[in-house]
Amino acid sequence: MIQSFTRLAVADNSGAKELMCIKVLGGSKRRYATVGDVIVASVKKALPNGKVKKGQVVKAVIVRTKKEIHRDNGSLIRFDENAAVILDAKREPIGTRIFGPVGREVRYGGFMKIVSLAPEVL
């Protein structure tokens, strides 16, 4: 469950290491985001030679959350950290690699490129 000011790890090789959520997209009063949702975020920590710089405002899709996700079949899944993948203007990932597992809900959001790059989809 991600809301404004939540800090997230970055699960790709775009050069950013940490993001801070600014806004959850998808409705004027939407407060929380979960796996597969798009957020607007600020880069808080970045590598000096990366594609994105510190302070840059980016869009990102959430791929892991500490808060458990309840599935339709009755199971639930949770991860050890909150993580996101940075997107470009065409909703494609900026990075060329994805680190760590991603939730299956990312596929339902239409982010097939992230699903295909991920080492594991849970």
Curated annotation (Swiss-Prot):
Gene Ontology MF annotations: large ribosomal subunit rRNA binding; structural constituent of ribosome
Protein purpose: Binds to 23S rRNA. Forms part of two intersubunit bridges in the 70S ribosome.
Source organism superkingdom: Bacteria
Subunit structure: Part of the 50S ribosomal subunit. Forms a cluster with proteins L3 and L19. In the 70S ribosome, L14 and L19 interact and together make contacts with the 16S rRNA in bridges B5 and B8.
A GO CC term assigned to this protein in UniProt: cytosolic large ribosomal subunit
Matching InterPro entries: Ribosomal_uL14 (IPR000218), Ribosomal_uL14_bac-type (IPR005745), Ribosomal_uL14_CS (IPR019972), Ribosomal_uL14_sf (IPR036853)
Family classification: Belongs to the universal ribosomal protein uL14 family.
Ribonucleoprotein is among the record's keywords: yes
SUPFAM superfamilies in alphabetical order: Ribosomal protein L14
Name of the featured protein: Large ribosomal subunit protein uL14
Pfam families linked: Ribosomal_L14
Record keyword RNA-binding present: yes
Keyword terms: Ribonucleoprotein, Ribosomal protein, RNA-binding, rRNA-binding
Biological process (GO), any one: translation
